[in-house]
């Protein structure tokens, strides 16, 4: 139980948080105003001074508690916020207030944990998306099975509110949050559909992102427990622990009982080589042991979602495959473990032996087809990868056009420099280079060949291929053999905290 005291102390401290009064503090909406969210929703009147108004917020909250608020005519959506009801304005204003207020206790918890020097030093590097890949390079080559898991959604909004109540004890705040979610997200249905979630995420992105991350955090909170104590649980009885009330007490009791007499016997059912990585709406679970334990985890996840989150999860949402026979997509890369076989000749006295050695190697590949589809959607090429001009940018200056294309190439090179094979990346850069030339030729109403011959832009456009070498030469020695070796090897950057806009996981 040495891993758990921090969580238990944090759980006790959260019981004293009171968030409801913060909704009536002007500085909360000042924070939302200063974060460049849609500022027009905070203006009391366009003809007066441009200041956010707490009076509007108080009137909106009061209106939400009124019974006649549920009956809305079709013409009310265009009324002034003082004389009538405006659904979009109400939703955005209160959503921003909820998002900022509900984040406060969790931000305080994060800042207090980062005050420790060791955590703060490692936190900066761990924020990077690329920090996942060196970890996988070290671990995946020793593992045998992988489970692709799609995290189920949408979760019912009432379940979200109930889960949040276990972490923050403030009854009035959650009454208002429940009213808000039902009035603006789930008014006419008892079932939360993907369409309603999509609409809510677009109109209230900050609050939606918090609720979704909180749902994933809660599910991983149980996963940590299952990871450490799954060998103690009989499958037909373990679901009783998913009741969130007194969860920590039940967990402590379980450890005390089973750690005394069964520690040696239960090691046969433990899986010490299991690794878990979550990204976007998916996660992967890898293990070295037999498929039996992976199937055990599959049933754990399905029952967790069904018993605790009331989500009907299909078994096909979790696919278990041998790692050497299966490739999976992770944060814009294709990953697969390749078997390298080599024969070694060994001679002992007059006898010669041939020994076959099998080494597993992780291949991290740029997904060329999804990237070409993304470039085609952005109008840089057609669906088969032939570069086309970008007429929308033709009104800009030559320098701005070239600079835009260079930024895209720079970002792609920065993101995909960890690839095992760079040919796909060079093809993407080639498409962008020709698209840039065609855009410039379109602007000057000329053919590509005539434009290059007249303007002499070939040297300038070589930056698409030379900029990466210049950056690497500043970091590493200028020896040509060193640079060639770096082009063949993978380079991970620990300053990437956002995925590229052209990266889409299928």
Swiss-Prot record:
Gene this chain is encoded by: matK
Presence of the UniProt keyword Chloroplast in the record: yes
Taxonomic source organism: Lathyrus aphaca (Yellow vetchling)
GO terms for biological process, alphabetical: mRNA processing; RNA splicing; tRNA processing
Protein name: Maturase K
UniProt-listed InterPro entries: Domain_X (IPR024937), Maturase_MatK (IPR002866), Maturase_MatK_N (IPR024942)
Domain of life: Eukaryota
Record's keyword annotation contains Chloroplast: yes
Stated role: Usually encoded in the trnK tRNA gene intron. Probably assists in splicing its own and other chloroplast group II introns.
GO function terms (MF aspect): RNA binding
Localization per Swiss-Prot or TrEMBL: Plastid, Chloroplast
Organism classification: Eukaryota, Viridiplantae, Streptophyta, Embryophyta, Tracheophyta
